[in-house]
A protein has these predicted regions:
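Short, extreme N-terminal segment that most often corresponds to the first beta-strand
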Residues: 1-23
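Charged interaction segments
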Residues: 21-122
Length: 122
């Protein structure tokens, strides 16, 4: 099993696209039910959260969804900031241990965690 937990931050238009990507999956045959979208969001940033224990064979599915989400373009062009969706996910595999998945700059970067998050695996 693999424990996946994390979040994305975005704007209104991007959140609508994230929901479209998530809702395209059948929750009876995927782990798309792990996504949560707060009913009331505050200020300018919108949030999407994911939490769930999934089978290791489904990790490719989750990775593909994050890659799709990462490629959602900025709603408004800004030369100073990259306004595409960004976020952080901690992925704990029973065998391979923990990895950190960073969504930013239009892509997904998977690596070792920068912090000591192993207490989450207790």
């Amino acid at each position: 099993m693999v424990s996946v937990r994390g979040w994305l931050q975005c704007d209104d238009g991007q959140l609508a696209q994230i929901k479209e990507i998530v809702e395209a999956d059948d929750p009876e045959h995927t782990y798309s039910g792990g996504w949560a979208f707060p009913a009331r969001q505050y200020n300018n940033v919108r949030w999407a959260f994911y939490g769930g224990d999934i089978r290791a064979v489904s990790l490719d599915w989750f990775e593909e969804r994050l890659r799709q989400i990462a490629q959602i373009p900025a709603s408004y062009q800004d030369d100073k900031y990259d306004e595409r969706p960004r976020g952080l996910f901690l992925v704990s595999h029973d065998v391979d241990g923990m990895s950190e998945w960073r969504v930013h700059n239009g892509g997904l970067v998977i690596g070792l965690p920068d912090g000591d998050y192993h207490y989450l695996d207790a």
